[in-house]
Amino acid sequence: MVFIPNYSGFVEAQSSKPVTNVSNLALSEDMKNVNLQNKTVQYFEDAQGYLVYPVSSSDSQGKLPAVVMIHEWWGVNQNIKDMANLLAKQGFVVLAADLYHGKVADNPQRAMELVQMARNNQNNSIANLQGAVKYLSLAPNVDSTKITSLGWCFGGGQSLQLALNSQEHPLAATILYYGTPLVTDKQSLSKIKWPVLGIFGDKDEAIPMGEVNQFRTSLNQSGIINEIHIYNGVGHAFANPSGDNYAPKETADAWQKTLSFLKKYVIET
C-alpha cells in the first residue's frame, strides 16, 4: 500500500536553496581523528550512492554496524554527505542511498517534482532501498545483523516504508526524523520487529501531533520497542539548516538521542 503525504506546511518549512551546516553537531576529540574512506558505489540497478566508512591502522578491525541514510527532498547533496561522514566517524558504515538517480534539486519547485516522481514509483523506491540493505549486508566490513535505516522528512517517510517492507532482510532499527507520510495504523506497523526512533516537533504543520501520538500508541500496542521524542516549539524540518524552522539546540539534542539509541539498540546488542 502506498501512502501519499499531506504537504500542508511542508514547503514553507524549507528555504529556497539547500544549505550545508553540521558544525552544530559536535564530535569528541577522538572522533575528530577518525580517518574515513568514501566512494561512489552502484548498489541497485542504475542507482549510485555515497558510501563512507572508518578505516583503522590496525588489521584487526572487526565488522561494523551500518546505516542506510535516506536523503531529504533535495537529494544526495553535500549536506547528506556531511551527515554520512559525521555518522561514519562514530563507527558506522554509511550508504547514502539515492532515490533520485543522480538528480539533486536546488530549489523547492524542483525538489517537489523529484519527490513526486519517487512517490509515483514507490515500489521502485522500496526496491532501491532494499538494494541498499542487501549491498551493505554483503559488504565484507559490515555486520549484516546491525543495519539501520535513517532519514529526514521525505527520507524519514521512506525509512518507515522500508521498515514495512523488510521482512526478507530484517533491520536492526528504524530511525525517522519527522517522516512523511507517517503510517499510524497498527496492522501495518506490526510488521516491524525491531526498535524505532521517531523525532518530531510539536509545531509541525505537515504532521499533526495527533498522528504522532497514534504512531506511538500503535507501536506500543504492537509490542515494538520505541522512543518517540517531541520537541516543543519547533516545526517541520527543524533539523535542516536550510530551513526557516532550523532549531540548532533541538537539532543537537536530537542527534545525541540518535547516537544513544544506536548505541543501545544496535551497537551493544
Task: Annotate each PLM feature.
Residues 99-103, 180, 234:
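Short beta-to-alpha linker loops that shape the active-site pocket of alpha/beta-hydrolase fold enzymes
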Residues 1-5:
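Sec-dependent N-terminal signal peptides of Gram-positive bacterial secreted proteins and lipoproteins
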Residues 192, 198-200, 204:
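Short beta-strand/loop motif that positions the catalytic acidic residue
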Residues 220-269:
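C-terminal catalytic histidine-bearing segment of alpha/beta-hydrolase fold enzymes
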Residues 130-191:
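Primarily recognizes the serine-hydrolase "nucleophile elbow" in alpha/beta-hydrolase
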